[in-house]
Amino acid sequence: MEGPYGNGFEKVEGKVALVGGGIGIAPLYMVGENIENCDAYLGFRERPILEEEFGKVTSNVYTTSGDTLITDILNVEKYDYILACGPTPMLKKLLEMTEGTKTRIQVSLENHMACGVGACLVCTCKTHSGNKKTCKDGPVFWGEDVIL
């Protein structure tokens, strides 16, 4: 077994929202442990879990499940930074929501990876500075650079 690959979220200061969907929620717990003054927004397909755990490491925890999307309850302009991990449609919506605001966003992509060393190109993603390998250059990218 090898890993983890690539890079993590860059350290930021200010008011931060951690936004996770599905399996993208788990990586945000450790991020919450290392950032002061952050809120967690967690979206679940079914019933919410981990609320109590996130409550120990964040200021506030907001959850949605079922037909309500986590992006439906998030006001991006309340935050200096958003750190997000989850399904591509959620990340794409967050990029749209932050466009034209002062809020900066980092997204952790959930692309499939095969070799883990950048040779196979399975995990390639598009950015404004050319194609990048999620396993080597990511999986975390600044929102203004990545194209979803």
Q: Locations of the language-model features?
A:
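FNR/FR-type flavoprotein reductase catalytic core
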Residues: 1-114
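Local cysteine-cluster metal-coordination motifs and their immediate loop/turn environment
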Residues: 27, 89, 110-139
